[in-house]
Amino acid sequence: MKIQQIFNELVDLNDTNYRFHLAKPSGEYIPSEALAYSKESWLGWQVYKGNNKNRFPYPVKYIFSFAQLSGNEFIFGGIFEILDREGEEYEVKYIDKYDELIGRVILTYTGANTRGTVFRPSHILENSEINEIYKVPYKGEKFCGIENINHTYYQLKLIYDN
């Protein structure tokens, strides 16, 4: 399914106001866990400027955000408006649009750039599709049984809390 069928404002989209953020694990931090844990935890993945201190260098206003589940599958994490670019972090806020789809829409990315995390909308629209829509929002990894536990405290807390 084309992304525009779910996110209808992308039909007439140009690359000037939006960027897509496909968040990927960073060391022991896993974006899908942050998304499942809380809005505040997930917000932390949007304010980070990266090593070059400007992940969204163009004057884009909005971030379509997704968290990597595995491989080339990403789950929708919401839309954020960039309010301020000064300082050590971006100042962003959630946009209520498509709130009911947070944690439910699964995007499959098929582009050649598998290392990047920030993309122009035109690239994502050409190289991605909606693979699935969960009935209920993603709440983290399912408990796999005590004999299979090889998880961090943070992962276990997420399972326990949900």
Regions found by a protein language model. Name each.
Residues 36-52:
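Charged, amphipathic alpha-helical segments
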Residues 1-19, 25-27, 34, 72-77, ...:
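Contiguous surface segments at macromolecular interaction interfaces
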Residues 27-30, 45:
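Generic detector of short, locally flexible boundary/turn motifs and exposed helical patches
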Residues 60, 67, 82, 143-146:
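Assembly/interface hotspot detector across virion components, adhesins/toxins, and nucleic-acid enzymes
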